[in-house]
Structures are given as C-alpha cells and as structure tokens.
Design a protein with these regions (language model features):
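Charged, alpha-helical scaffolding/interaction elements associated with membrane systems
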Residues: 73, 85, 403-405, 472-473, ...
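Cofactor-pocket helix-loop regions in the catalytic cores of large enzyme subunits
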Residues: 420
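Extended non-globular scaffold/tether segments
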Residues: 377-388
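Short, Lys/Glu-rich amphipathic helical modules
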Residues: 397-413
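Generic structural signal for well-ordered, non-membrane alpha-helices
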Residues: 62, 77, 388-399, 461, ...
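Conserved catalytic cores of very large enzyme subunits
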Residues: 145-375, 408, 412-415, 426, ...
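Feature captures hydrophobic
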Residues: 1-145
Length: 973
C-alpha cells in the first residue's frame, strides 16, 4: 500500500488537503500481538513500520489474525460492521480510521465494487429461495385501502369550517402537484451535499476556529453566529418547479446533509463506495468527494465532539464503552437536536421583531454580563442570516416569475415573491405566509443543528388561526371549499419539503437505526395550554395529508385526551393508521402528563407537550430536553451480571465484580437481582458521564444561537441553549430490552429459586451454549414461565421493578445543562442491532436474535392481544417519563368492511387508554405481505411500517430488521 501511494501520482495527490499534507499514523495489532504494524502518512510519503508508535493517531486492535485478513478484503461499509460486531476495536481518532478506509477503497475500489455487487446478488438469490408462492393481490392491497374512506359529522368544538372533518371526498389524485412530488420522493436516490459543510469550513479557514484573526480566543457563540450568517448569505437559493414553498435544505432534490463537527467524518471511508452499498446507497459527485476529502474532513478531523472529549478527558472509560457499540450508543456524538422551538414566536414577530426584543432586553439590563451580551448579539446575527436567505429567495422567485411562460405558475411565483419579502422577517398573516415562515425557519435550524430528531411540534395549533382568518375573508361556500383544497395542498407541499433531506448515515448506521429519516415529529390534537379541547380544522387537514401521502417523515404523533377529545377524532386516527398501515402514533394525554408530574412543570407548560423525534415528550418552545441523548442496552447488564462483570461479546472484564453463578454466590433471587442492578447502574453512570462530557463539547464546538433565540428564557438568562439557557432542561434515555429482561428474570426467579426445577449453573451452561444440546431445558424456559404480556401480575410487577430502577438510576443524575435525566422504553431499531450483539438469554431467546421492540411483549407471550394491552397499560407511568413504544401488528378480517375494521381498532385503542396505557402504534400489515415485500421489493416501494417510535419504508430495512417485523406477533381484529 505504501509503495502504491508513494509511486502513483493519482494516489499521492490524495494525501494532500487543499493547502498541506494529510499527516497521520494508523497502527494495527491483534489482542495477543501476533500481528503488529503501522503505516504513517507524512509530508506526502507513506511508510510502513513493524511496530505501533506511541503517538499513533488511531490503532485498530483485532480479535485475531483472521480479522486482519478480512479487513483488507472487505469494502469500507463492511469494515465498520466488523467494528460493530466487536471483531476489532479502536483506540484513538475514528476520523483517521475512516480516512485509512478511504485510502483502501482508492486502492481496491474495483475489487470492492465487485464484492458489493456479489453481495447484492447473493441477497437477491436468498430472497428468491426463501419466498414461497403468495397471493399476487397482496401487492395491491395498500392501494385498495386508499380507495376506502369514511365520512363523519363534526362534533369537535374547535372545528369551525369542516362539515366532514374526515375530508373523505379528497384523494391523492385530486392533487397532481403532490403526486409529482411523491414520485420524486419514492424514485430519486439521495445525494450527499457538501454545500453547508464547505461554506462553513471556508469561513473558519479564513477567520479561525479556536482563535480569531487577531489571535484572540473566539467566543464560541459569536464565532458560530458569524459563520452561520456567512452560510445563509451564500447558500444557493432554490425554488423547486411547481412548489408553493421556497427554499431547500440542500442543493439536491433529496440531499444528505454533512455535519463534520459531529459525525460527518464517519462517511469518509465510503466516499468511493457509498453509491454501491446494498442498503440506502447515496449518490456522490466527484466535486463533493474532492471537497469533503481535501478540504472539509481534514479541517474537522480533530474538531468534532468525540475527539474533543477524547483529548480533553484522555479517552475515558465511558467513551471507550460507547465506541464498542454493545452496551450503549450516545446520540450526542451526532446531535443535540431533540427539541421543539417556539415557532409561534417566529410567526407572531418575525426575525425583525425578535431582534427588537433582544435589543429591548439588553436595554433593560444595564448590568448584563459579557456572556449575556455576546449570546444575544450572536442570536441577532443568526436571525439576520435567516432573513438574508429569505431575501435571496425572494429575488430568485422574482427572477423565476419573469422567466415563467405559464400564467398560472407565474402568478404562484409572484405571490411567493411577495410572501418572501414579508416573512420570516416580519409577522405572518395568512396560511401561505405561515407555512413559508415555518419552512424557512426549519431550513435555518437545520443549517445550525444536526437534522436528527429536531421536531416541529404542535403545528395544527399554530396554523389554525391563519386558516381561520383566511376562511373568514371568504364569502361563499364555493370559495371556502376551494380554499380547503388549497390548504390541503399547501400542507402537502410542506410535508414533501420535509422529505428533501436525510441524515448522513454511514453503513454501520443501517444496522443500528436502518430506514430512519430525520424523524421530524409533528404532534396533533390533545388539549390547549389552558386545558380545553385542542382538536381543530387544521388537525383534520394535517391528518388528511398524512393519509393521502403515506410518507415516513414528518413523523406524525397524535395526542388523545380521554377527558376532552371526541371519539370521532380517535376513530379518525385509527382510520388513517389503517390506510397508511403505520401512522400516526397515538398517545394518551393523561398518562404522558402523569409521567412528568415529578418535575413540577407549570400546568400550562405541561399541557403544551409534544412528541420529539420518535415519541418523547417536550414542552414546546420552553424545554431543551435532548430526549434521545442515548440508547441504553439494559440486556448487557443482565449478561454482565451472569458473568461477574465480564461482557461476553466484548470479551472485557469491564463491570464490577458482583458474584459467580458457578461458585454459587447467589443464594436468593434478590442476590442476583442486586447483581443485575449493580451492573445496570454501572452502565448508566458511565453513559451519563460521557453524555455530560459531550454536552460540554457541544457548548464549545457548536453552540446554537438561532435555536436559542426561539427557546424560552435563553434571551432573559443570556445563555445559549447548549449551556442551560432554556426554561426547562433535561436529557432523555431510551432503555432497550425491558420485556427480554423481565422474561429472563422471571425464568430465573420461578424455575431456579421458587420452584427449584433447574440449577442456576445448569441454566447458565445452556445459555452459554445457545441451548444447543438442551432442548428440554429450552422448552421448559419458553413454555412454563408466565411472561410479560401474558396477563401475569407477577410478570408486570417484575417489569415495573426493572423500569423503576432505570428511572431512579437515571433520575439521580444531572446533565451538563443542570437538568434531570428521564427514562423511556422505546428502541428505534436498536432492539435489532443490540440483539445481534447479544448472546442467548435465560428466557430462551437465542443468540443474535432481536429483542422485542420498545416495551412490546415477546411474540409468544399470549395469543390474546388484550393480555398484551392490559400488561403494558399496567406499567407505572411515573417510571416512563420519556415515553414508550408499544408496537402492535394487527390484521383486519377479510370479511369486515372498512368501517368495521376502524371500529375494531378504535375499541382496542380506547380500551388501552382507558386502562391507563401511554402510547400505542399499529402496523396494519400481514406477515404474508411483509414476506412478499422481501421477495418483491419493487412492488412495495412505499410500504410503510412502524419500527419502534419511527416509520420506515419496509424495503429499505436490513434483513434482520425485516425478519424482526415479520416475526412480531400478529393479532386478528
């Protein structure tokens, strides 16, 4: 390799940035040092050594010699999967590992491309072998559902203009513009866009990052604000053909945004191969490849969140645990975005009004600290940048209108020009203006913060006054009917604009959270801040758009308040869920608010909660909650408790010594339960430590002045949101594997201790052997113990006990911003990823199999859906203050009409909520349909499924995730 890079000019030039050489050293060794080498790239020369120098930038430590051979043969995406499976581990800067993988791909690109093609062909062949003869009509079933719609009579007090709130007379075919946008969404391959990262890097190269042009340390807020303004002033203003909204997140029709100060360099190794990978391939132009490799990534290779913590805290244990992927995954390495902003403020005041508010705050506070003055100045600069982008778009709209030959489109562009000259700089007055202002604000926020979980919030509440004002101006029924149709189309354009970008996911991410988009949650219904029914006209218009488009993002969540909201509304939620197969997610207002009681939030703030990212509650515009700061694999603690602190996959004696099963150290079940909670507490303590370090990193590397300007109290406190400026602060964890842990603990308690039918050492031997040679024991543990979801009060008690420990252990900590930690029980798709990294369990679950999603019971817990419903609803809401994901796969009876199916779904959801259940999401698909989609993905490109908190297109998921969905319990209704 060294010789090739030294002698081939085409490779030698890859060792340069735009103005210097890329100097770094990569070490390679096995755990037992049977192999030890390094390669250095310095001053344009590559050199191999027979040892690893102490100053190596990154060292890859392989499990054995075979992994070294695999490393050199596999394409970059598969190399990262070796890391995920703990076949090798890293010490040092991950950016340089990815740069080295990029160099390998340049050297072996042709071979790797052939390997990827071979891998794809093998997958197709496997599907063909596994598929059986299925009903050809399966592929058309979803289309048929869209043809069946029911009407309703308005009973909701907040609905003023819709005689039929279900809007049953409208279908997608009534909106050719949306049909066109949807086709682009479903057929266009995403492309990596370098615009944002390139412009920001240009500014920092010119003006400095750590110090300014005069050598003085930068105030991070001012540095970020000035770079942001430069970005917004220089972005390409784009208005897509036929769109009613202006502006784009990237320069591509569907663009992948690069955030190099967080996780952007994780794609470095795939700059050549990203277009050929089997899952979620990305287009990447030669210009983008060159820009990222020669300019962007070199600048940020040591200026990102992981590397700031590594250098500041000497690669702490908490960080090393995260980088093994098996026990927890820290989202703050990629984002601090899970929050909801005060969009009503932007609509009410505009950027100009908010700037005036900032000036008034500074004038009123004569003793303002330097921090406050700098923070508020940074907010103003960012708001000016957003307004500048809107002005550029207005000029573009005017130019497009002048060149447009079609009179109807010219009129739309002229109207858009007027709108952009008004908002977001000033207050919005019409629905057109409000949606454009929100969209432009949304673009602006994603130019500052990672597009992962940043959520829109209660958009029906914000838009209703504008819709009502527009309708009040109309005199005839015909005018109002036409305007309702336009409102549907406008909202449809907004939904489709939200699909114009995707998060940057290296191939390893396809296994951790495959199929996920940006998870931009919107929330409908519920109650108002003063406690009244919040369902309104826009609630139903948004539900109509959700129904006809059936797209994965925005992630639609619906609040249902049993005391205030109508059955008509809940039935509509169920009908939309039936037609789309997977959305919206439904939440019990009373249970969610009960879960948050411990924090003493003001009632008006609590009633204004909305879902964030997946399902997590945030108090809209007042709460920096980072509700998905981490994914915690609770099952890892069980494995460590069974192995005296040793983690089997990592082969690491990392946890505290809590006792040996073989030595008979656990005389009682309580002894073992104590060992489990000690290990889980150890993992929680470490995850919190690393999360707090990353929080500090964000405050230094990427404070967020624009976001802070739309977050209550940041202005008054004079403190950025990353430093605790928001009115309410917290951090939320997702605890994964509750049902699997509960079932395993029930097996241990019942069979080992209560009934003494098996010895603990015997059970452990069977678990260690993946139950091979222990069929009788496997049958015993899977059939003779009451499971969570079976209707067993004892199993529910065990689940509550585990959930309470997680809640209390997280709740004992405070985050970097001074707020509490919350605990939720949902999993995105990490129940699959963590499952593949986990051995067999006492419950009988075999090694490598997925955990149950969220806190959904194990598929064989009960053949009766009501048992599942009762057990999940029996969990104590106080322990679930970051919400849950209860996934149910239901299959309508072929003999039932559309109306009857909706009634059945309504009955189950209503019963669950009446019992106190917090959240429910349904996949209304058959196992046969999913199997057919695996075999014939071309027939199911828009088949929507609910994973655990978010939606995905089934055909974009990795095989393990598809099988997990297929293997979920299927209940007839």
């Amino acid at each position: 390799m060294a010789a090739e890079f030294n002698l081939r000019p085409s490779l030698t030039k890859e060792m340069r940035t735009n103005d210097s050489w890329l100097d770094f050293t990569v070490g390679f060794r096995t755990e037992r040092n049977t192999v030890e080498q390094s390669i250095s790239f310095k001053d344009g020369k590559a050199r191999v050594r027979s040892s690893v120098p102490a100053g190596a930038d990154v060292t890859m430590i392989y499990k054995d010699d075979s992994v070294v051979r695999d490393m050199l043969r596999l394409p970059p995406n598969e190399v990262l999967n070796l890391l995920l499976k703990n076949r090798f581990r890293l010490e040092g800067n991950l950016s340089y590992m990815n740069l080295f993988n990029y160099y390998l791909s340049l050297l072996l690109g042709g071979t790797q491309k052939k390997m990827l093609a071979k891998s794809k062909a093998a997958a197709v062949e496997l599907l063909a072998r596994e598929s059986r003869d299925l009903d050809p009509a399966l592929a058309s079933e979803m289309k048929e559902r869209h043809k069946k719609r029911i009407s309703a009579t308005n009973v909701d007090e907040g609905v003023k203009f819709l005689d039929d709130p279900y809007l049953a007379s409208y279908s997608l075919d009534d909106f050719p513009r949306l049909v066109k946008f949807l086709d682009v969404h479903m057929t266009r391959r995403p492309a990596i866009c370098h615009e944002r990262s390139s412009l920001l890097t240009d500014w920092f190269l010119e003006n400095g990052f750590e110090v300014d042009g005069e050598g003085q340390p930068w105030v991070p807020e001012l540095r970020q604000a000035k770079a942001y303004r430069y970005l917004m002033e220089n972005r390409k203003p784009i208005i897509h053909a036929d769109d009613l909204l202006a502006g784009t997140t990237t320069t591509k029709e569907i663009g992948v945004v690069v955030y190099p100060d967080t996780h952007g360099t994780m794609i470095w190794g795939e700059l050549v191969s990203a277009g050929d990978r089997p899952l979620s391939p990305y287009e990447i132009s030669e210009e983008t490849r060159q820009t990222l490799h020669h300019k962007v990534f070199p600048f940020w290779s040591k200026r990102n969140m992981r590397e700031w913590v590594r250098s500041s805290y000497d690669q702490p244990l908490s960080q090393r645990l995260d980088e093994r992927f098996a026990v927890y995954f820290m989202w703050k390495t990629a984002a601090l975005s899970h929050t909801i902003l005060d969009f009503p403020k932007l609509l009410r005041l505009g950027t100009g009004g908010i700037i005036a508010e900032i000036d008034a705050e500074l004038a009123a506070d004569a003793s303002a600290s330097a921090e406050k003055k700098n923070t508020l100045e940074a907010m103003k600069i960012c708001l000016e940048g957003l307004a500048a982008y809107a002005r550029n778009l207005a000029s573009q709209a005017e130019a497009d209108a002048a060149a447009e030959r079609d009179p109807a489109r010219r009129a739309e562009l002229e109207r858009l020009t007027e709108t952009l000259r008004k908002v977001p700089a000033g207050p919005a007055e019409t629905l057109d203006e409000a949606l454009n202002a929100i969209w432009l604000g949304w673009i602006g926020l994603h130019m500052e913060s990672t597009n992962a979980g940043l959520s829109i919030g209660r958009i029906d509440q914000w838009l209703q006054p504008f819709f009502a004002a527009d309708m009040d101006e109309l005199k005839t029924a015909e005018e109002r009917e036409a305007y309702v149709k336009r409102a549907i189309e406008l909202v449809g354009c907004f939904y489709m604009r939200c699909t114009d970008h995707l998060p940057l996911i290296p191939d390893i991410g396809n296994y951790l959270f495959g199929g996920s988009s940006s998870d931009q949650a919107i929330t409908l219904g519920g109650i108002t801040p003063d406690g009244e029914d919040a369902v309104n006209d826009m609630t139903y218009i948004l539900l109509k758009v959700t129904e006809i488009l059936g797209i994965r993002d925005p992630n639609v969540n619906a609040r249902f308040n049993p005391d205030k909201n109508s059955d008509t509304y809940l039935k509509r939620l169920c009908e939309v869920n039936l037609i789309t197969a997977a959305t919206p997610s439904m939440h019990n207002d009373l249970a969610v608010m009960k879960s948050l009681e411990e924090f003493g939030y003001p009632a008006e703030d609590l009633r204004d909660w909305a879902a964030t990212g997946c399902v997590e509650p945030t108090l809209s515009g007042k709460h920096m909650g980072h509700t998905n700061c981490m994914m915690m694999n609770m099952v890892a603690a069980l494995e460590m408790a069974m192995n005296d602190g040793h983690h089997p996959l990592m082969n690491w004696d990392v946890g505290p010594k809590t006792g040996s099963i073989e030595a008979g150290d656990f005389a009682t079940f309580e002894d073992f339960f104590g060992a489990f909670t000690t290990q889980l507490g150890f993992l929680i303590d470490n995850s919190v430590e690393y999360n707090n370090m990353l929080g500090e990193a964000h405050s230094i590397i990427r404070p967020t002045p624009l976001l802070s300007s739309l977050q209550d109290d940041c202005m008054k406190k004079g403190r950025d949101a990353t430093k605790g400026g928001a009115k309410h602060n917290s951090s939320g964890a997702a605890c994964i594997g509750l049902a699997d842990i509960t079932d395993s603990l029930m097996v241990i308690k019942k069979l080992v201790y209560d009934e003494e039918r098996i010895g603990f050492a015997e059970l452990k031997r069977a678990v260690d052997a993946n139950f091979e040679g222990a069929k009788g024991l496997h049958a015993l543990v899977t059939h003779k113990v009451p499971l969570f979801g079976s209707g067993s009060a004892e199993a529910v008690e065990m689940a509550n006990r585990v959930a309470k420990f997680a809640h209390d252990a997280f709740g004992a900590h405070r985050n970097f911003r001074g707020g509490p930690y919350t605990s939720g029980f949902w999993s995105m798709s990490n129940h699959v990823a963590f499952g593949t990294l986990t051995g067999a369990l006492p419950s009988g679950r075999l090694a490598g199999k997925a955990f149950t999603p969220g806190l959904t019971p194990e598929p064989n817990a009960s053949p009766n859906l009501l048992d599942n419903i009762r057990d999940v609803a029996s969990l104590d809401a106080h322990n679930l203050n970051n919400n849950i994901a209860f996934n149910v796969k239901v299959v309508p009876s072929a003999s039932d009409s559309h109306e009857q199916v909706v009634e059945h779904m309504f009955s189950y959801v209503k019963t669950y909520f009446d019992l106190g259940g917090m959240q429910m999401q349904m996949n209304v698909v058959t196992t046969d349909m999913l199997r057919d989609a695996m075999a014939h993905p071309e027939n199911y490109r828009n088949l929507l499924v609910r994973i655990s908190g978010y939606n995905a297109y089934f055909v974009t998921l990795n095989r393990d995730m598809q099988l997990e969905l297929i293997e979920r319990a299927e209940y007839g209704i």
